[in-house]
């Protein structure tokens, strides 16, 4: 989980409270924020400052700043409750977006009259970097630029240019101008994030005088560097996913609002950002009480939700909940139930022992999986663990497989384009793992045991019409690997587990024709193995022969 270091003095002034160490250690965990440690450090002026390190759950990116933590804590403690209104005024600032294939989405906001000092400046920089990590996947999905608005003049333009088309002084090189290409070669950030620049096209943001504000996702220009004397801030967020870009902007401007900033919208190709329109969800009192095992009345539930900085209307035993724009984690009514539990007080829940006695034992399927695991480890393989979430390109297109929407379960609101569907096979994930480790020495022998999810229209037991199946898959890569090697491994595993099995010739689009076989157990097909097709190897940007198997466990 990400951690943030917060100056205690800064937290106290934002909370408008004097906070003892005991209060911090007792109360913050109750609102879902763990206190890692409290320590002292020397600041730039030589004074001792007390620092609190918090551990933040990944589903609460609004807590990645001291401003967000203070807002949440004021609500939790009952100091400021209910929906916090964020007024957004229209500015005359305009941005023109020209074709930009590599990072097509961009959003802007203007926040004026921010009460800036060293602590505020440090908080802005920290939030920027934490959001890069938490929402931006290390700038791949989104990148944030913060600028001194008074140093430039609109309108602004976001476009792609060639590597030698313009020169500007990047942050850290105040007096040395470079081309975008030179920045990738010489600048620390260019060397680190240059891989995100595709096809030699460099995204750039310029003002009306062609001054460079930013070259996302690499570096800002030194012209708009934010200092403790800056008060009017222009925020740009570029990325590959529209929803993530807008969510990050909402979190950022709401944090600056806590510093007495006034939020102004910016016109980006005819659309105004930020959009802080609240969302609404309806939930019943009975549903909340049933889930929590409590008997709360409407007033108690409304009070708890108001502590979560939401507003609630009560009609016909139903609650209409008004959710702030920065709460991108509220995706389902179960999230509202969690907010009620948290703000009602976890300490008020009473544990009850069940009235029956049971004896625990390992699940039979897990015992079987453990046997598979031990066998593969004995064969000299390394075990890996991948996510169950994947995407159509990895599961089907790179594997040379045809597919339709009936072949996979799709995620309704995916957090990223890489995680849009539930995997139907483990083998593509192993090939991705080999790609990530292609710089390591060969041979590489890996396996994974895990769940795959398939659509089952005949399922009458659940509403989802889906079923989880357990599979094992392995892959071997080195210059001399061949069908005989994977056949030996597969037969060895099958003798240890299934006992009786048959092997027949098999044609599979992911494997070389004539070098693939299917596995039968009591006449039922349970898996396949063979040499991976060269096209598939190239699709995953790998360079050596690969053999693999995939077997159904249950």
Swiss-Prot record:
The species this protein was found in: Methanococcus vannielii (strain ATCC 35089 / DSM 1224 / JCM 13029 / OCM 148 / SB)
Family: Belongs to the phenylalanyl-tRNA synthetase beta subunit family. Type 2 subfamily.
SUPFAM superfamilies, alphabetized: Class II aaRS and biotin synthetases, Putative DNA-binding domain
Name of this chain's protein: Phenylalanine--tRNA ligase beta subunit
Residue ranges of coiled coil: none
Binding partners and assembly: Tetramer of two alpha and two beta subunits.
Pfam families per the UniProt record, alphabetical: B3_4, B5, PhetRS_B1, tRNA_synthFbeta
Cofactor(s), names only, from the UniProt record: Mg(2+)
GO molecular function, one term: phenylalanine-tRNA ligase activity
InterPro entries: aa-tRNA-synth_II/BPL/LPL, B3/B4_tRNA-bd, DNA-bd_dom_put_sf, Phe-tRNA-ligase_IIc_bsu, Phe-tRNA-synth_IIc_bsu_arc_euk, Phe-tRNA_synthase-like_B3/B4, Phe_tRNA_ligase_beta2_arc, PheRS_beta_core
Keyword hit for Amino-acid biosynthesis: no
Gene that encodes the chain: pheT
Subcellular location(s) per record: Cytoplasm
Signal peptide: none
PROSITE patterns, sorted: B5
Binding site for Mg(2+): 329, 335, 338-339
Reaction it catalyzes: tRNA(Phe) + L-phenylalanine + ATP = L-phenylalanyl-tRNA(Phe) + AMP + diphosphate + H(+)
Keyword Metal-binding listed: yes
Domain B5: 276-351
Highest taxon, organism lineage: Archaea
GO biological process: phenylalanyl-tRNA aminoacylation
EC number: 6.1.1.20
Keywords, ordered alphabetically: Aminoacyl-tRNA synthetase, ATP-binding, Cytoplasm, Ligase, Magnesium, Metal-binding, Nucleotide-binding, Protein biosynthesis
Any GO CC annotation of this UniProt entry: phenylalanine-tRNA ligase complex
């Amino acid at each position: 989980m990400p951690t943030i270091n917060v100056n205690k003095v800064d937290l106290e002034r934002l909370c408008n409270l004097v906070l003892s160490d005991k209060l911090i250690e007792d109360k913050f965990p109750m609102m879902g924020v763990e206190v890692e440690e409290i320590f002292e450090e020397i600041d730039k002026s030589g004074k001792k400052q007390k620092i609190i390190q918090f551990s933040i759950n990944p589903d609460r990116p609004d807590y990645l700043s001291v401003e967000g933590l203070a807002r949440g804590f004021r609500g939790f403690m009952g100091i400021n409750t209910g929906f916090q209104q964020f007024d957004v005024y229209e500015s005359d600032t305009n941005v023109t977006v020209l074709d930009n294939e590599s990072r097509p989405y961009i959003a802007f906001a203007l926040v004026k009259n921010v009460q800036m000092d060293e602590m505020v400046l440090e908080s802005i920089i920290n939030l920027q970097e934490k959001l890069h990590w938490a929402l931006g996947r290390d700038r791949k999905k989104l990148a944030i630029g913060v600028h001194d608005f008074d140093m430039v003049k609109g309108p602004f333009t976001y476009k792609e240019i060639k590597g030698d088309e313009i020169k500007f002084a990047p942050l850290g090189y105040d007096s040395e101008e470079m081309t975008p290409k030179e920045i990738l070669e010489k600048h620390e950030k260019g060397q680190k994030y240059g891989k995100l620049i595709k096809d030699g096209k460099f995204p750039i943001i310029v003002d009306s005088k062609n001054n460079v504000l930013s070259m996302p996702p690499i570096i800002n220009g030194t012209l708009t560097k934010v200092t403790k004397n800056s008060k009017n801030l222009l925020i740009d967020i570029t990325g590959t996913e529209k929803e993530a870009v807008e969510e990050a902007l909402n979190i950022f401007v709401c944090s600056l609002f806590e510093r007495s900033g006034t939020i102004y919208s910016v016109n980006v190709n005819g659309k105004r950002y930020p959009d802080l329109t609240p969302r609404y969800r309806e939930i019943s009192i009975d549903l909340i009480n049933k889930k929590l095992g409590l008997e709360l009345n409407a007033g108690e539930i409304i009070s708890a939700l108001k502590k979560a900085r939401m507003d609630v209307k009560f009609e016909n035993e139903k609650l209409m909940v008004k959710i702030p724009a920065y709460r991108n984690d509220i995706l389902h009514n179960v999230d509202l139930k969690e907010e009620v539990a948290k703000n009602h007080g976890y300490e008020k829940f009473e544990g009850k022992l069940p009235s029956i006695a049971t004896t625990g034992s390992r699940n039979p399927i897990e015992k079987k999986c453990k046997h598979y695991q031990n066998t593969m480890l004995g064969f000299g393989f390394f075990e890996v663990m991948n996510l169950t979430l994947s995407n159509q390109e990895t599961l089907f297109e790179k594997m040379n497989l045809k597919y339709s929407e009936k072949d996979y379960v799709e995620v309704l609101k995916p957090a990223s384009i890489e995680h849009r569907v539930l995997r139907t096979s483990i083998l593509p994930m192993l090939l991705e793992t080999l790609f990530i480790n292609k710089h390591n020495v060969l041979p590489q022998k890996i396996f994974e045991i895990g769940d795959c999810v398939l659509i089952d229209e005949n399922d009458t037991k659940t509403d989802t019409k889906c079923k989880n199946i357990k599979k094992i898959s392995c892959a071997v890569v080195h210059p001399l690997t061949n069908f005989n090697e994977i056949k030996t491994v597969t037969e060895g595993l099958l003798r240890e587990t299934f006992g009786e099995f048959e092997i027949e010739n098999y044609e599979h689009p992911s494997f070389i024709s004539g070098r693939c076989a299917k596995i039968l157990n009591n006449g039922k097909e349970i898996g396949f193995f063979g040499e991976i097709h060269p096209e598939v190897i190239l699709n995953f940007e790998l360079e050596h022969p690969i053999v693999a198997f995939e077997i159904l466990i249950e």
